[in-house]
Amino acid sequence: MNIVITGAKGFVGKNLKADLTSTTDHHIFEVHRQTKEEELESALLKADFVVHLAGVNRPELDKEFSLGNVSYLDHVLDILTRNTKKPAILLSSSIQATQDNPYGESKLQGEQLLREYAEEYGNTVYIYRWPNLFGKWCKPNYNSVIATFCYKIARNEEIQVNNRNVELTLNYVDDIVAEIKRAIEGNPTIENGVPTVPNVFKVTLGEIVDLLYKYKQSRLDRTLPKLDNLFEKDLYSTYLSYLPSTDFSYPLLMNVDDRGSFTEFIKTPDRGQVSVNISKPGITKGNHWHHTKNEKFLVVSGKGVIRFRHINDDEIIEYYVSGDKLEVVDIPVGYTHNIENLGDTDMVTIMWVNEMFDPNQPDTYFLEV
């Protein structure tokens, strides 16, 4: 299928093009400000589907709203009258189309123009009124508060919040792209007779700001945010996409001694924490037990043995472990345990524990295996 994307260099256009080229065999024609007239005409006359994303939202003069959102669409439709395949057309409109302002009025005029075209020429059309959008590749300091806040917070720049209680209606760009793909396949999401993008979020500005600062702090205290809330999951992915390319990595605190090292990697309030333990050859670590704290050990490099003994018994249980055969070993409560490096190289063990370490209540009691 030949798909034309106008506004292909914009926020949604870049995400849509990246997805379509990665997941489909469609031939994509990109139309943008640098596209020559003959290239535009050639693409539109070959089109099986047109995704019209091009538009204007922050011009210097109000009259540019009409030029960008109505006149350009009219020009595209004029060319499409000569496309005998009658391609379906998807228009990105805005929830502001119902509002009395130059931008909203131009969007409404564009909708009316497309409907009239469909009635006259018989093309299938999909008109989507999108709310505020967020996601990767959205231009900061322009038209998106989330993009601007992500960019600034990731760079330790000050942000301005005039009213924390302002509620935003939002769609995530991946949901937009998924819906466009459904429309291309002829299976759009229709609610009350209107094409709709699922997963509309209503979130206050204050909630967004608080989450973004938590995400920033999480790199310092080695925590992971809760990701069971879809909006928070999408916002976290968005925030990370605005990290400076020189700031992808961050240091961990390595506790190093002559036995090796122990380093906390990730901590969560409800799923425990993950650490990396490195033991030098011949070293034994552990010899303690827990009442409630439980662990999982996974040796990923080297070889060794994990020994257990019930604190009320003399029997010693051994599990031989190796990075050549990845196996998880559960560490039950009430068993004293240790881990010994039996190899000639460092042994690396991933350790999960069911709770974050609390120095005031470590639940760890020394006892030789």
Task: Set out the residue ranges of the language-model regions.
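Mid/C-terminal beta-alpha module of Rossmann-like enzyme folds, strongest
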Residues: 182-254
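NAD(P)H-binding glycine-rich loop region in Rossmannoid oxidoreductase-like domains
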Residues: 35-75, 79-83, 96-100
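Double-stranded beta-helix
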Residues: 313-315, 342-369
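Conserved beta-loop-beta element that borders a ligand/cofactor-binding pocket
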Residues: 112-137, 147-151, 157-166
